[in-house]
UniProtKB/Swiss-Prot annotation:
Role, per record: Protein S19 forms a complex with S13 that binds strongly to the 16S ribosomal RNA.
Protein family according to the UniProt entry: Belongs to the universal ribosomal protein uS19 family.
Protein name: Small ribosomal subunit protein uS19
CC terms in the record's Gene Ontology section: cytosolic small ribosomal subunit
Source species of the chain: Methanoculleus marisnigri (strain ATCC 35101 / DSM 1498 / JR1)
InterPro entries xref list: Ribosomal_uS19 (IPR002222), Ribosomal_uS19_euk/arc (IPR005713), Ribosomal_uS19_SF (IPR023575)
Keywords: Ribonucleoprotein, Ribosomal protein, RNA-binding, rRNA-binding
Molecular-function GO terms, alphabetical: rRNA binding; structural constituent of ribosome
Length: 137
């Protein structure tokens, strides 16, 4: 049998589309055009209006600042944020998050988890009745 000497082609990642629109198309749209595409929860947030803090975060993103830190976990990820890295506070520290196209119209807080899984060790001396008789090391 003859061996195949062809190189494997790297897998091409399909271009992300949101409800039939590419990220570039979404970035060109005005907010009034984006509202019908958003899920209901995000649409309600924009209908009620953004707070000053949310407006300031969007202004910082538009200005091109590299280091953006925020406590605004309830901010909706807009198409203009794609490709940027934002540090989101999780209650203890800031976690750096790279905004991917798949994250559009999700909340920032979904990507900086506030709880960590607890890995309990073995019981210590006196933790239970049976551990009273465990010899010390």
């Amino acid at each position: 049998m003859a061996k195949k000497t062809q190189k494997r082609m790297p897998r091409r990642r399909e271009e992300f589309t949101y409800r039939g629109y590419s990220v570039a198309d979404l970035q060109q749209m005005a907010l009034s055009e984006l509202l019908p595409l958003m899920p209901a929860r995000a649409r309600r947030k924009f209908d009620r209006g953004l707070s000053r803090e949310h407006e300031k975060l969007l202004a910082d993103l538009r200005s091109g600042d590299e280091n953006i830190r925020t406590h605004l976990r309830d901010m909706i990820i807009m198409p203009e944020m794609v490709g940027r890295s934002i540090e989101i506070h999780n209650g203890k520290e800031f976690q750096k998050v790279e905004i991917q196209p798949e994250a559009v119209f999700h909340y920032l807080g979904e990507f900086a988890l506030t709880r960590r899984r607890v890995a309990h060790g073995s019981a210590g001396i006196g933790a239970t009745r049976s551990s009273k008789y465990v010899p010390l090391k």
